[in-house]
């Protein structure tokens, strides 16, 4: 089956936003207008096509990023719908990694919100070109120009308006297209309502000229010929302007801003035109860098069908009909179903079974996938999120994705033996699907511990366990993921000796143990010269050290950011073994942690509270009582925005407290920011509770 669309005609893009900015509704409208969805799904009716998990339809939020293919003006659009809730930023990271462009949706009333900032930063990290769509222009309080100012003030973006709204709130009826200098007016709010091009209303003509001039000046800066002509009094024509806006988006020189109301069916078609006209194709994004599988030297892959095949797995889902499906982006070459490939990230062979094109949760079998395609593969055995699949004869490892550490945990106890078995299977599937969700067993209590990015994240996992996998279990209270850290350098010389006749045990190790840089993790280095500890015992040393990392000396929390050097040791020809060195290393490391002034670290959250002004005093007083540090305040519309850093331990149940003293009018978002040392008095309480 040959390629149906040239790679230049692909647009792989995502729709990113803060929760409730109308992202899923915008996607639904896109699917409707591109002819994919016959009946439009409304989020508040729980029928959105892209939100197909039960939990999403109930909560009205998007949890998993579904991938969908549709067509507009003969271009092939692969859309990744991403969640906007802060507990699911991992999904956004994963999607951005495989996108070529993005549409950032803002709520016309709220402007740039905390999660918008997070997503914008993630898009910066992966160099994703983007256009901005100011949605909900029909809402009370919608303010297009405030949103544009927010893009500059809150995310240091460079907005350039390509459209201006005609009317606002209930009188919003269309947009001014600053490239054509025409008004686009919709004749009603019905689905697929027709629109017409008209002359710009007289009362908006001056404003249109002012913003068109700003747009042209931003564009001609990118092209010497256009700049020269403009200085001579010749404005660029429509086609030149579109080319220059496209160039600006690809170079991230500025961010074009459009507006509309997806819910009221206004502004979606021009947004689709902008996706086609301005967002890059895979060919525009150019080569992708990777590492040679054998030599680990940098190599490149080009987005052509003739290059060696390579693809990146960016999402794994469990599908009730097909089993495990792995969403992949093909970066180079082509692959047929039935092909044998290698997972170069894990050095495992895989066979490509069924290949599916996904439309939310409908699927279509395809026999072949080409550079630029986003496909779902059924039946892969060993592939995880972030792994590379490629041609075994020319293997490459595409860049790894980095995933954040979980900050909150709960214990789960199955109610029966049957539940125990179901729980094991379910958790291994959930952990494979979501790298920010970790599962472990508490060595002391034998309980299963689930770790995640926030209360909602874990709530939804528990919900999936109960509903999808029918596991009946007791769920503990959420606990903070504390960490332990050494503060002083220690030199420890330790000998493990057990010689009581017969084969004994003997191992001596001498370590320098010192704090590592924050976030640098654990580092081990052997500085042994002259064979004081034979090479075959070094893995035993590492194993002993690793066994302590999982449970520190203060209260059994994981140890972070520590550097260990093995500088000397001794062995016995008969009595030494890897096990003896493992035992010696474990004891020496524990001694170093005890003597090295270990302290407790706790996750500190970045909290933003949006509250009517009359409750500001109560909000600040309450945050202070939670050991919060107020970082600043500003106004957003008629609400006060309070930013603070607060330890996670003091944020449990905050949502109910905030609702009660603000009569439900204040809301908040929080996300993990950093770990810091727990004050002495608090630390003593935590140690007494857990030790």
UniProtKB/Swiss-Prot annotation:
GTP binds at residues 17-24, 81-85, 135-138. Keywords: Cytoplasm, Elongation factor, GTP-binding, Nucleotide-binding, Protein biosynthesis. Residues 8-283 form the tr-type G domain. The keyword Ribonucleoprotein does not apply. It is found in: Cytoplasm. Pfam families: EF-G_D2, EFG_C, EFG_III, EFG_IV, GTP_EFTU. Belongs to the TRAFAC class translation factor GTPase superfamily. Classic translation factor GTPase family. EF-G/EF-2 subfamily. Catalyzes the GTP-dependent ribosomal translocation step during translation elongation. During this step, the ribosome changes from the pre-translocational (PRE) to the post-translocational (POST) state as the newly formed A-site-bound peptidyl-tRNA and P-site-bound deacylated tRNA move to the P and E sites, respectively. Catalyzes the coordinated movement of the two tRNA molecules, the mRNA and conformational changes in the ribosome. This is Elongation factor G. It comes from Methylorubrum extorquens (strain PA1) (Methylobacterium extorquens). The gene is fusA.
